[in-house]
C-alpha cells in the first residue's frame, strides 16, 4: 500500500471515529443567559417498584437480568391496568377501595384505604416504563444503607417506640400526618402519588417546586455561604453551582425531624447532615438525579441514591391540599378531647 492511500484511509477512519463519538453526545439545551437548561415538569414515577435497598441476594449487581426485567415489566403493566380500569380486578386494592366507598365504609387507619399495602398504581401513579435498577441505593456497591452509629440506633429505637401510640397533643402527631413537609429526599423519592416536580430557572437562581406538599426550594448559584449554624429548617439551606452540565445543590442547616425515605420516613438525620444533589440532563426527556447523604452522627459512612426523573407529556402538577384548609388535625384533637370529657355512665 502506498503512503498517500494509507494516510487517506487513516484520516477517514479518524473522522469516522470522531463522528461516531459526537453522535453519542446529545447537545445540551441552554438558557438565554448560558446555563444548562433543566426547566420543565418532571416526575420520578418510573422508579416506582424499585426498592430503596437492594435485596441481599443481588449482591453488588445493580441491574436486572432480561428475565427479571420482563417480570418487572409485567407488574408495571398490571399497575397501569389498575389505574385505567380499577373495577376490572376484583382483588385489586383499588377495587376494594371503590367497593368500600360504595358501601359507605370508612377507609382503614392511615389513609391508605381498605388495603394498607402501598401498591403502585393504586391511586393513579404508575411507572410508565420498567426500571432495570435493583435498588435506589447505588453506593455503597452492595446497594444497602450503611450501618447506623450508636446515636443513629438510639434515634431509630425512639422512633419505633413512639409509633402508633395515642396522641394527646399536636406534638405527638408525625410530620407526615400534619402534612407539613416530606423533606428534601421525601419530596422526590417516588411513592403512590404526587411524584412531580417543576424546575424554573432565572439568572443566578434555580427554583424547584414539588408536587408533594407543594414545597418550593429557591437555590442561589452565586457562591454565597450557608446560613449560620444555629439555623435549622425542614428543607434546610440549599446553595448550588454548576459542574459542567450538572447542577450541584448542597443543603445544610437541616433540622432533625426528617429521614431519607419515602414521605420523609426512615431514621431521622442529625442537624449536622449535608445533602448533595446532582441534576444532569442526559436527554430531552430525562434528568439523572443523585442524592448523597453525609451524616456521620447517624450513619457510619456516606451513601447515595440515584434514579432518573423524566418529562412525560400531559403530566400536570395539581394543588396538594392534604387535609382541606389544614384543619383536620385541629378538628381531630377537638373531637377526641370532647369524647374524653364526656361523663362516664
Predicted region positions:
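PEST-like low-complexity, intrinsically disordered acidic/proline/serine-rich tracts
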Residues: 2-6, 18-345
Amino acid at each position: 500500500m502506498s503512503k498517500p492511500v494509507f494516510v487517506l484511509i487513516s484520516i477517514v477512519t479518524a473522522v469516522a471515529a470522531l463522528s461516531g463519538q459526537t453522535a453519542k453526545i446529545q447537545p445540551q439545551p441552554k438558557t438565554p443567559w448560558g446555563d444548562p437548561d433543566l426547566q420543565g415538569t418532571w416526575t420520578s414515577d418510573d422508579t416506582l417498584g424499585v426498592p430503596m435497598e437492594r435485596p441481599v441476594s443481588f449482591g453488588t449487581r445493580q441491574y436486572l437480568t432480561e428475565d427479571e426485567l420482563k417480570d418487572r415489566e409485567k407488574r408495571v403493566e398490571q399497575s397501569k391496568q389498575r389505574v385505567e380500569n380499577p373495577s376490572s380486578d376484583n382483588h385489586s386494592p383499588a377495587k376494594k377501595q371503590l367497593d368500600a366507598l360504595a358501601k359507605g365504609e370508612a377507609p382503614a387507619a392511615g389513609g391508605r384505604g381498605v388495603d394498607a399495602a402501598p401498591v403502585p398504581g393504586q391511586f393513579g401513579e404508575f411507572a410508565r416504563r420498567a426500571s432495570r435498577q435493583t435498588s435506589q441505593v447505588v453506593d455503597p456497591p452492595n446497594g444497602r444503607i450503611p450501618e447506623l452509629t450508636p446515636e443513629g440506633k438510639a434515634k431509630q429505637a425512639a422512633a419505633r417506640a413512639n409509633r402508633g401510640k395515642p396522641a394527646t397533643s399536636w406534638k405527638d402527631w408525625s410530620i407526615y400526618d400534619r402534612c407539613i413537609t416530606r423533606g428534601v429526599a421525601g419530596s422526590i423519592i417516588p411513592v403512590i402519588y404526587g411524584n412531580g416536580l417543576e424546575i424554573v430557572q432565572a439568572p443566578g437562581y434555580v427554583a424547584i417546586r414539588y408536587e408533594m406538599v407543594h414545597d418550593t426550594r429557591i437555590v442561589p448559584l452565586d457562591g454565597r455561604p450557608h446560613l449560620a449554624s444555629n439555623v435549622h429548617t425542614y428543607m434546610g439551606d440549599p446553595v448550588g453551582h454548576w459542574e459542567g452540565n450538572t447542577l450541584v445543590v448542597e443543603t445544610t442547616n437541616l433540622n432533625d425531624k426528617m429521614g431519607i425515605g419515602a414521605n420523609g420516613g426512615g431514621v431521622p438525620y442529625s442537624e449536622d447532615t449535608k445533602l448533595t444533589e446532582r441534576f444532569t440532563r442526559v436527554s430531552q426527556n430525562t434528568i439523572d438525579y443523585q442524592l448523597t447523604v453525609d451524616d456521620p452522627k447517624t450513619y457510619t459512612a456516606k451513601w447515595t441514591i440515584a434514579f432518573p426523573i423524566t418529562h412525560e407529556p400531559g403530566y400536570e402538577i395539581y394543588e396538594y391540599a392534604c387535609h382541606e384548609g389544614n384543619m383536620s388535625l385541629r378538628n381531630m384533637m377537638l373531637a377526641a378531647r370532647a369524647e374524653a370529657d364526656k361523663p362516664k355512665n
